[in-house]
Structures are given as C-alpha cells and as structure tokens.
C-alpha cells in the first residue's frame, strides 16, 4: 500500500521530469511488479494532474536455466505492437517493470515516438526517501560524461590488485542524472553515474573483487577475493577459493552451456558513480526481494564493472553481472577522476 510520504517524494521527482497537468502518463507494470511501487507512481502522477492510465502486461516465463536478476533488460513487452503504440504516443512512461526498459529491445521504438521514459528502479518505495535531490548532480554527471566521451583510454587500478585497461575509441558513452531531459529521453531513478559500452577488442587486464565489493545479481557482498583475468573483452579465468568464486563460475557457465558461446563472460559496460546520497552499505538493511540494487551502482566514487550483453560490441546474452567496486582509482588519459574510491575535484572545475 502506498503511503503519503512516498507519494510526495515521487511527485516532486515527476515534476523535475516535466510532468504537468493534462499530460498523458502511462504507468507500465507487469504481473510480477512491486504493487506499492506501481501505486505510488500512479498516485503521484494523478496528484500532479496527469491523465494517467495503467498498462499491465503478463510477466513472461523465464526461459533461462537460472534466475535472471537486475539486468535492466525487461522481457515483459514481448514486442507487442499494441503495447508499443500506447507507450510511444504517451507523454511520459513510468516504467515499473521488474527489470526495467533501459536495455529492452523495444526501447528505441518507444523513444522514437517522442515519449519520455522514467525507469523507476524496482526498489521498495522507502528507499527513495534517501535519494534526495541534489541540484548539482545533473551538472556533475554532464561534466563527467563529457570527459568520458572525449577520453581515449580508461585505466582502473586498486590496492587489491585490479589493473584494467579500456580503450575508448568506438565506445558509446552515457550519463544518468535520474531526470528525463525532453521528448524521446530515458532516465533511471535513482541516477548519478556515467558509463561506457566499449567497442569489441578493447578491454583487457585484471579485475580483483575484494571483500565488500558487490555482486548485484546475487545481492551479495564479496567475502573472499575473486580475481578475473580479462583478454579480448572476455573473462578467461576466475580465480578464488571461496563460495563467491564458485557462484561466479557456476552462474556464468549456465549461459555458456545454453547459448553456445562466451558472451556472458564479456565486458558489458564500465563506469563510475557520482551520487553522494547513494550508499554502498545499504544491502545489509533490506531483504533481497526488497531491492534491485541501482543505488549500489551509483554511490559516489564507485567503479562499476559489468559483464554480459553489449550492443556496441555486437554481443547479446541474458547473463549479466553488475559489480560495483570500492577503493579503485579510475583515470582517463592519465588524469584521475576517482582516487582510491573518492571522487577527484578537477582543477578545471569540470568534475567534482
């Protein structure tokens, strides 16, 4: 059941996304969506005078050998032309699907119609109480994105042993502020991170997942180190003697057996977090079913390494790991943007 404290927070955010009286708003959900999230979104949009209607689709059967979690690639729309027509002609789509439309194959069709899409992360509404609006977050994300888009090389190191090189030529970059930016735009809430989807053959080195880093598919903090050796974009070795390494190997191998290739082992995207209100330690305070993990992707000073699908590299797979890491140093063309897990204030005031 929705509560007033959540409705007010959602309404404030929808105002930032430009929702005003009379605009057509679709609240998109599926049969497995979180009911209190859907209700809160609907009531907030109605409060602002939106012409609101619900569009509910069935959650499809999972055709994979393992459970799918936290991918950002909802399969709920199933290419249904009537559903796509309704979404594309709306002013604002409030995406309350379980996985979200961010990487869904139908997203481009919806955005081409001019709709704005706000992907509301599948968190318990209580979580949004902590995602306070920072007036400067949009500026800082834009500045960080400009630096990332101009850079030729990203290098990531850590005291734990990470030493990763990503050549950025041909990469597609993006920044998320959490706020839609006009017709045909998408944002996910909470926001506050920048990402690069590398071109093929550009990622190599070593990633060491240290205790306290997070595997968001499992909603689990790493307890023992796991070392990933990466060559030609793909994980070639998973080293570690604890259950974290065993889980990592087991989950990815399931996709390789079904899909017949190693796309699940490949690099999906890399980036860093800028959201000062997001926290890395919040997982301990919620049941796994109450969260999706977007907050962990965005906490300030994090480095995010992700495996799985990458359209830029021509790779498609249902297997996906988002791996937010602490205490990393991230450089772009030799200039630090994150030092040992802390955001670096740029001397030219381009990023803080």
Locate the predicted segments by residue.
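Active-site bordering "gate/hinge" segments
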Residues: 1-231, 256, 261, 328-352
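Dual-mode signal for accessory low-complexity, basic/Gly-rich regions
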Residues: 221, 237-307
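Internal helix-turn-beta structural module
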Residues: 289-352
